[in-house]
Amino acid sequence: MSNRGGGGHGGASRGRGGGRRSDQRQDQSSGQVAWPGLQQSYGGRGGSVSAGRGRGNVGRGENTGDLTATQVPVASAVSGGRGRGNIGDPTFSVASSSKTVSVASSSKEESKNTEVSETMSNLQITSTETKPEMTSLPPASSKAVTFPVRPGRGTLGKKVMVRANHFLVQVADRDLYHYDVSINPEVISKTVNRNVMKLLVKNYKDSHLGGKSPAYDGRKSLYTAGPLPFDSKEFVVNLAEKRADGSSGKDRPFKVAVKNVTSTDLYQLQQFLDRKQREAPYDTIQVLDVVLRDKPSNDYVSVGRSFFHTSLGKDARDGRGELGDGIEYWRGYFQSLRLTQMGLSLNIDVSARSFYEPIVVTDFISKFLNIRDLNRPLRDSDRLKVKKVLRTLKVKLLHWNGTKSAKISGISSLPIRELRFTLEDKSEKTVVQYFAEKYNYRVKYQALPAIQTGSDTRPVYLPMELCQIDEGQRYTKRLNEKQVTALLKATCQRPPDRENSIKNLVVKNNYNDDLSKEFGMSVTTQLASIEARVLPPPMLKYHDSGKEKMVNPRLGQWNMIDKKMVNGAKVTSWTCVSFSTRIDRGLPQEFCKQLIGMCVSKGMEFKPQPAIPFISCPPEHIEEALLDIHKRAPGLQLLIVILPDVTGSYGKIKRICETELGIVSQCCQPRQVNKLNKQYMENVALKINVKTGGRNTVLNDAIRRNIPLITDRPTIIMGADVTHPQPGEDSSPSIAAVVASMDWPEINKYRGLVSAQAHREEIIQDLYKLVQDPQRGLVHSGLIREHFIAFRRATGQIPQRIIFYRDGVSEGQFSQVLLHEMTAIRKACNSLQENYVPRVTFVIVQKRHHTRLFPEQHGNRDMTDKSGNIQPGTVVDTKICHPNEFDFYLNSHAGIQGTSRPAHYHVLLDENGFTADQLQMLTNNLCYTYARCTKSVSIVPPAYYAHLAAFRARYYMESEMSDGGSSRSRSSTTGVGQVISQLPAIKDNVKEVMFYC
C-alpha cells in the first residue's frame, strides 16, 4: 500500500508532498486496513493540533509555537504517518521527550487527490489488529497551543457601519507592582477582606503607603502604580463588626501582611497589540482589570464578571422586580477587559440576575409553595423542597431587632411545637416554651418546621416567622417557566433602548476616577464604531415539481408557498395516539387528516390510512399504550402523539419511543391540535420530513459543487456540545452530543449520538475509547468512529475533510478542549485506517458572550431588519475581534424581539486553509439550512442540532431518575471514582434520522 501523497502529518514531514521522516521505515504502513476497498491513505495536513502549524494555515508566515509531543496529538505518534506538514509554513518544530526535530519547508505543490470509488463492495468495517493505542489523553496546558492567525480580513458583502458595546481603554506607561496580601484571621468573605483593606488604605495611605491608592482583588493580590516604600510590612487594622441591621458593633483586630511579589510594565502589552509578540500578557491585563473592577466590587454585588444592585435601573423602582415564588430580579451589568484589534477595550452590557426577596421566611414559603394556610403541617415533599431552597441562606434574627444574623443549615423534620431540647440541669423544654419565657414571644406558626442553624450535632432551632432573608442573596436554582417569562419581559430591550442603557451605565460608573488616573487608564464613553459587511443570503434549492424551484431569502426569512421539499420522505406505516382528555373525540382524526395533507402538499409521500386505528388513552397509562402500539404495529415509521393537557410527560414519551421501542415520534400540544392552524401544520411537516429521512431544502451551491473546500472532496461537517445539569443537581452527569452530516455534497442530514460523562465535565470523553469486549478483547469505539462508519455507509465515501463546530466552550478552556478532543479525533481516524489523517478545521461557537452590535442609524430600514436589529448576514472581523487570531462575529438571523446577539466563531485549528471569506460564507450559508423552520438561525445548524440532541438526552436521564427506572440504567466509574449513570442506548433506526428535531 503506497503512502505517497502524504498520509501522516505533523512534526517531521516535508511540505505538501510525499516527504518521509529520516527515521521512518518505508514499509511502515503494514497494519490491517480497516476501511475495506481503501488502497491508499488520505492526506492530512501537518501537526494535528498542529505542532508545526504555528497558526496552522496555508502559506501563513512563520510558526512561533513550540509544542511538546506530550501536549499535542501529533499524527505521526498516532499513525506512524508521513506526508504533509504545515503547508507553506517556512519553519516549524515539534519537541519530543528526547530531541527537537526542525524541518524547513517551501514546497507549494498540491499532493494528488486519491480517488475512492463511490460504490464499494463491502461496507462492513472491522477493528484494526494493530496494538491498541493508549487511551490516556495528554495533559492540558493553558498556554500549550497557539491558534491560527487571521488569514486576512473578509471582503465579501455590502459594507455597513455598526456600533459595538466595546469602549476603548487607553493606558499610559506605568510600572505596575504586585503585592501578596495575607489577612489574619482568615475570612471567607471578599466583602470583609475589602473592608479591611479600605480601612488600611484610609489609615496608612499617606504615612506608610507613599500616598498610593492600591487596587485590591478581594483575596490575595494588591496592585500599585509604582512601588510602595517597603518590600514587606505588617499592619494591624481594627474593623468594626457590621451588625445585621447595618449598625456598627465592637472592633475586631486583623493583621495584614503585605509583601512584594513582582513588577511589570506595559511594554509586553504594547508589543502584543502591535502584533510583534504572540503571547498575550495576561498578567498585565489582570492588573488593569482589577483596577477597573475595584470601585464596583465595593459598591455592588459581584457575580463572576457581573455586578448587580437595585440602584442600577433607570430609577429606584426599575432596579428590581418580582419574578414570583419569592424570587426577584436585580438589574446590573457585565464588564470585561479584552484584547482587541483596536487595542484594549472594555466590554459593557446590561444584565439581570435572580435574587431571593428579602422577606420573612414564612412569607417566602407562602409564595414558594403557593399556600395560604401556614397553620397546617407541610407535606414531606414540600418540606424537602423548602429545605433545599433555604439551605445556606443568611437570615436576620427579628427577635434580636435584626442586629444578629445566622446561616440556615436546614429545617427540622418535626413541627416546631414538637421540638424539645435538654437544658444544663437535664430538664427538657420545648422550643415554643423557650421563646415564650426567654423573649416573651408566642410562636405563631407552630405547625411549621423550625429553621435550623448550627450543626447537626448541635442544632439551634428558630421560629420561621422570626427569620428574615438577608438582601442581595443570589437564587441559583433553575427558574420555572413563569419566572423565565417574567425575567425576559422585564429585561428585553429594543436595540436603541439597550444602547442607551449601556451608555448611561458607562457614565454612571465613571471609569475615569482617581484610581484609574493613578494607573494611567482612561476609558472613552463612546461605543466603538466598526465597519461591518452584510453577506448575501444563499440560493436555496427546492424540488423541481414545485412552482418555485429556487428561493433567495430576504432578511433571513422565506416561506413554503409554491415550494416542495427537495427530498420528500415516504411514510407507509404510521398512527396517532392522544393522551389529552380535553380535546373532542373526533379531533385527532381531523388534525391528522389535515397534517398529512400538508405533508403531501409539500412533497412527502404519505399513506392515508394509519397502520392501526388511532388510540385515546389517559396520561396515567402512557407506557402501556406505547408498548401496545409497538406490539400491534411493528416497524412503525412515525407515531403522532397528542400530549397530555398537563406538562411533564414529553420526556417520558421520548425516552420510551427512542430508547426502548425504536419509534420515531412527533409530539403535538393539545392547544395547537384544537386550533387546526395551517402555519403550525406546515412547521410540523418540516419536522416530520427530516425525522423520517427526507430533506427540506439544500444549498444550491452544494448541488452545483460550488462551495470552496467542501464540495471538492468528501467532507463531513460535525457539531458538538456538552450540556450540564442545572445548579443544585450535584450528582447528575453532563451529557455530550455529536452530530455529523451524512450526505455529501449536500450536507443537510445530520445523524446524532449522545453520551453521559462526569458531572460538569466540559471535554467530550467518548469521542474515542477502547472498550473491553468479552469475546474480542479491546475494541475501538466512540462517537467519531461510529459517525465515520455511518458516513461511509451512507455516501460510499471516506471523509477527507472534517469541519468541527464545537459549542459551549469558554476562552479559558480553548487549549484544553482542542488538545484532548483533537487527540481523540486522530485516534478514532487511525483506528479505522493506519495513516488516515483527514484535514480538520476546529471552530468554537460561542453565544454566551456579551458583545452586541447596533445599527449606526436606528430606525433606518435600509440598515435594519423589521425588529430594528442589524441585518441577517452581518459579519465583523475587525476592531473588536482578536488582535491576531482567526475569529469573527456573525449575526446570521433576523431579530424577533429585544436585541440580537451575534454568534462568535473562533478557529482553533485550520488544516484546510480557509480564507476569511470562505469560512464566513460557509457558516452563514449553513445557517439557512436549519430543518425546523424557514428562517436563518443564530448559530450554525450542526452546533444547534448538537445542543438539541444533548437536551433530548437529558430527558432520558431525568425520566430515569424521576421514574425510578434503575433497572434500565447502567453506570460506569471514572478514573477518579465518580459513578456516572449511563444513558439508555438510542435504537439504531432512530439515530439514523434527525430524531432530535
From Swiss-Prot:
The keyword Ribosomal protein does not apply. Residues 638-958 form the Piwi domain. It comes from the Eukaryota. Residues 1-144 are annotated as: Disordered. One of its GO terms (cellular component) is ribonucleoprotein complex. The keyword Cytoplasm does not apply. Residues 93-106 have a biased composition (Low complexity). Involved in RNA-mediated post-transcriptional gene silencing (PTGS). Main component of the RNA-induced silencing complex (RISC) that binds to a short guide RNA such as a microRNA (miRNA) or small interfering RNA (siRNA). RISC uses the mature miRNA or siRNA as a guide for slicer-directed cleavage of homologous mRNAs to repress gene expression. Associates with siRNAs of various sizes, from 21-24 nucleotide in length and preferentially recruits small RNAs with a 5' terminal cytosine. Probably involved in antiviral RNA silencing. Associates with siRNAs derived from cucumber mosaic virus (CMV). This is Protein argonaute 5. The lineage of its organism: Eukaryota, Viridiplantae, Streptophyta, Embryophyta, Tracheophyta. The gene is AGO5.
